[in-house]
UniProtKB/Swiss-Prot annotation:
The lineage of its organism: Bacteria, Bacillati, Bacillota, Bacilli, Bacillales. Its main location: membrane. It is found in: Cell membrane. It catalyses: ATP + H2O + 4 H(+)(in) = ADP + phosphate + 5 H(+)(out). It comes from Listeria welshimeri serovar 6b (strain ATCC 35897 / DSM 20650 / CCUG 15529 / CIP 8149 / NCTC 11857 / SLCC 5334 / V8). This is ATP synthase subunit alpha 2. ATP binds at G169, D170, R171, Q172, T173, G174, K175, T176.
Length: 504
């Protein structure tokens, strides 16, 4: 069989005409240094800041330093398999995390991958972890209360939806307990909660998750964890992942509470990365942009205006102090960014005042306008009374011959401190908080022994639940105090049934 030359040429022409090649152009670099969660690569001249890069073994990294010859990369995963000389290629994408309703009830890492063993998360939505905060005209002032269920906070330093309220104190002063109790109190408040655990022990995170599950709070909570054993890049990214998940809900008109526990560990992780990337150190060896690290995170908490759906993100960042020093670098930075702070003091904690809130140093700059009218009425003078009591208490140690007015103030102060104490994981509904504070302010507790005050409160709540539920309902629905004559009559009736116990 002979093949003609014309046939061969026509077949070749046909093949050439039908040939479609898709050229894949990608920038590829070479790893020149690897170690401590950091890589340096040569040849990625077109890489963008914050771009995701892929190593030859599939591990992802993020471009942080763009230099003349090298790119400094933080590695988002195990880096022990990466070697000098390995390929690293650009992806053209920036870091994104999965978002949406499917995340609720799950425990995820900084990359949004599940770590709770309950299978993959069925969601297709993603959001970039770095986003521009809402502008001035997109916001409205804080006007809705966020009830924490903690008497000392709701009365003295109220928090509104869309506020940033710093919780600051030494280690082991109950910071995490305040956050967990606040999450537990959101059960019927139409609020989604996100708990971001940064640099915590895995056992601590497990305990927090079990507490939330036990009280049914995981039904509206997402837990983002970057444990102490994780590489520093994951600790640095965890808060941004948490707020990206929150923004998805906020822009859909929902209300979100985000707890960052705690930002001093994130700052330490960022310091570690910056020093490894050879950025110049500043005060306390933190890099120059450590303020921006936190400001760009916390500015994303906002109350959106009604045309954008009126959603909100409320942020509760934590900062750990050393020996109560709130004038250190990170504490002063975050105090200046937030709308107030709650200062937890170790002296108060160890003396049995829990939550150990120092009313003198704690402040809420915008929460007052969100406080309900009933609470404003009863808690108006509480802060001043408490401050006066603390002052008198320190003077009274030096002399016993005090006049009757001073003694009365001291006795009232003792009862105020006692009323503001609260058991762990027992948040109190706002109407019951108003009730006990009304009783305190109107001198119903003046003749109750100090050691009986909490029992008085507990029995009073039970009595009102059974005998005067309509008064509690009125406070809850109208957010104002009920008719004073009815309230006084009910309190007197209960007081007659209360039997003080003998002195211990």
């Amino acid at each position: 069989m002979s093949i003609k030359a014309e046939e061969i040429s026509s077949i070749i022409k046909q093949q050439i005409e039908n040939y479609h090649s898709e050229l894949k152009v990608s920038d590829v670099g070479t790893v020149t240094y690897i170690g401590d969660g950091i890589a340096r690569a040569h040849g990625l001249d077109n890489a963008m800041a914050g771009e995701l890069l892929e190593f030859s073994n599939g591990v992802m990294g993020m471009a942080q330093n763009l230099e003349t010859n090298d790119v400094g990369i933080i590695i988002l995963g195990p880096y022990t398999e990466i070697r000098e000389g390995d390929e690293v290629r650009r992806t053209g994408k920036i870091m994104e995390v999965p978002v949406g309703e499917a995340l609720i009830g799950r425990v995820v890492n900084s990359l949004g991958q599940p770590v709770d063993g309950l299978g993959p998360i069925e969601t297709t939505g993603t959001r970039p972890i770095e986003a521009v905060a809402p502008g001035v005209m997109q916001r409205q002032s804080v006007n809705e209360p966020l009830q924490t269920g903690i008497k000392a906070i709701d009365a003295l330093v109220p928090i509104g939806r869309g506020q940033r309220e710093l919780i600051i104190g030494d280690r082991q002063t109950g910071k995490t307990s305040v956050a967990i109790d606040t999450i537990l109190n959101q059960a019927d408040q139409d609020m989604i909660c996100i708990y971001v655990a940064i640099g915590q022990k895995e056992s601590t995170v497990r305990n927090a998750v079990e507490t939330l599950r036990h009280h049914g709070a995981l039904d509206y909570t997402i837990v983002v964890t970057a444990a102490a054993s994780q590489p520093a890049p994951l600790l640095y990214l965890a808060p941004y992942a948490g707020v990206a998940m929150a923004e998805e809900f906020m822009y859909n008109g929902k209300h979100v509470l985000v707890v960052y526990d705690d930002l001093s560990k994130q700052a330490a992780a960022y310091r570690e990365l910056s020093l490894l990337l050879r950025r110049p150190p500043g005060r306390e060896a933190y890099p120059g942009d450590v303020f921006y690290l936190h400001s760009r995170l916390l500015e994303r908490a906002a109350k959106l205006n009604d045309s954008l759906g009126g959603g909100s993100i409320t942020a509760l960042p934590f900062v750990e102090t050393q020996a109560g020093d709130i004038s250190a670098y990170i504490p002063t930075n975050v105090i200046s960014i937030t709308d107030g702070q709650i200062f937890l003091q170790s002296d108060l904690f160890f003396s049995g005042v829990r939550p150990a809130i120092n009313a003198g140093l704690s402040v809420s700059r915008v929460g007052g306008s969100a406080q309900i009218k009933a609470m404003k009425t009863v808690a108006g003078t509480l802060r001043l009374d408490l401050a006066a009591y603390r002052e008198l208490e320190s003077f009274s140690q030096f002399g016993s011959d005090l006049d009757a007015a001073t003694r009365a103030k001291l006795e009232r102060g003792k009862r105020t401190v006692e009323v503001l104490k609260q058991d762990l994981h027992k948040p109190l509904k706002v109407e019951k908080q108003v009730l006990i504070l009304y009783a305190l302010v109107h001198k119903y507790l003046d003749d109750v022994p100090v050691h009986d005050v909490l029992r008085f409160e507990s029995e009073m709540n039970t009595w009102f639940d059974h005998n005067r539920p309509e008064l509690l309902e009125e406070i809850r629905t109208t957010k104002k105090l009920p008719d004073e004559a009815k309230l006084e009559a009910a309190l007197k009736e209960f007081k007659n049934t209360f039997v003080p116990s003998e002195e211990k």
